[in-house]
Amino acid sequence: ACNTATCVTHRLADFLSRSGGMAKNNFVPTNVGSKAF
């Protein structure tokens, strides 16, 4: 399992990028991750 915010954020970003290509362009984990969550 993945419990840390960083890990969850990256997994979420990866999931979104696989589900819809546009999500990857609108979501930047390195810049928004910690603030978005």
Curated annotation (Swiss-Prot):
Pfam families in the record: Calc_CGRP_IAPP
S-S bridge residues: C2-C7
Keyword Isomerase included in the entry's annotation: no
One term under GO cellular component: extracellular space
GO BP: adenylate cyclase-activating G protein-coupled receptor signaling pathway; regulation of cytosolic calcium ion concentration
GO molecular function: calcitonin receptor binding; hormone activity
Alphabetic keyword roster: Amidation, Disulfide bond, Hormone
Modified-residue entries (Phenylalanine amide), positions: F37
PANTHER family named in the record: CALCITONIN GENE-RELATED PEPTIDE 2, CALCITONIN-RELATED
Entry similarity comment: Belongs to the calcitonin family.
Biological role stated in the UniProt entry: CGRP induces vasodilation. It dilates a variety of vessels including the coronary, cerebral and systemic vasculature. Its abundance in the CNS also points toward a neurotransmitter or neuromodulator role.
Name of the protein in its database record: Calcitonin gene-related peptide
Source organism of the structure: Pelophylax ridibundus
